[in-house]
Amino acid sequence: MIKEAIAKLVKKEDLTAGQMNDVMEEIMTGEATDAQKAAFLTALAAKGETIDEITAAARVLRAHCEKFLNDMDVLEIVGTGGDGSNSINISTLASIIVSAAGIPVAKHGNRAASSKCGTADCLEALGVKIDAAPARMAQILKDINICFLFAQKYHPAMRFVGGVRKEIGIRTLFNILGPLANPAGASMQLFGVYSEELVEPLAHVLHNLGCKRAMTIYGMDSIDEISLSADTKVCEFKGDEFKSYTIKPEDFGFTRCKKEDLAGGEPAVNARIARDILEGAEGPKTDVVLLNAGAAIYLASDGITMKEGIEKAREIIKSGAAKKQLERFIEETNK
């Protein structure tokens, strides 16, 4: 099937969901050759992925992941990465704050690919045992409302595309698929994308995949988070109701900063910054974390505004609950 699919893609023809399913099965089982995978991913990227193509591919990747037993509605704050911003680990810190608010968060991530410090690198530098057994992580999620799912542990079939992705060196379908394949089956997602063109399509993909509520976001300074240094494009849905809008930092009382004000560094640097933020340090790095954590609290809650979500996130830091949550996370994963 993959050869026929490549022939369609080079003619700029879309694949049906069934065709994408068949091609992904060939890729995820190691049946397709490296040359075929490279040609397919390049041709698909050049054509542009449709909602149906991404949905079908994500379903196959989910089917091939290691199972994680979870029966709770969980939130994930995640991004496609590859934005080149080398910022602090915003979504990681927001996840800790949101979980301290009593909202279950299953953070799914990996080591750095294009940045200096990925989610896994930051948590490890903070002292979290990132590769705890799935059953242990499931229990931690139940006990303290947060867990970390180390992507390479749960997606063994990704080994069939890792080399090809590095060698062709362009963004491909798999930059989008990874964040769509949380093994805990996140039913709520604050989902950052690397392109404005993906904001609305990815919201519909999440809806197709059974997500109950989500916000897909793109910071207009090319960041896959809600930005403090630019406006942010948003597509939100709760149930079947979709709405698109723009977030401005000033709308929530924040002062717009320069993009470089949000820069991080190596894992040890980002871990130190993370502790400072959770201990109540002020400044743009804390503000951008509050903006994203507040949006996530708003998304996962009923009857509150985003501004109220941000104030709740601020109070969680001020009360010491966020710092305490990190310490519990470290302690529980190292038992």
Swiss-Prot record:
GO terms for biological process: L-tryptophan biosynthetic process. Pfam families: Glycos_trans_3N, Glycos_transf_3. The gene is trpD. GO terms for molecular function: anthranilate phosphoribosyltransferase activity; magnesium ion binding. Belongs to the anthranilate phosphoribosyltransferase family. Mg(2+) 1 binds at S91, E225. Disulfide bonds: none annotated. Pathway: Amino-acid biosynthesis; L-tryptophan biosynthesis; L-tryptophan from chorismate: step 2/5. Homodimer. Mg(2+) 2 binds at D224, E225. It catalyses: N-(5-phospho-beta-D-ribosyl)anthranilate + diphosphate = 5-phospho-alpha-D-ribose 1-diphosphate + anthranilate. It comes from Lachnospira eligens (strain ATCC 27750 / DSM 3376 / VPI C15-48 / C15-B4) (Eubacterium eligens). This is Anthranilate phosphoribosyltransferase.
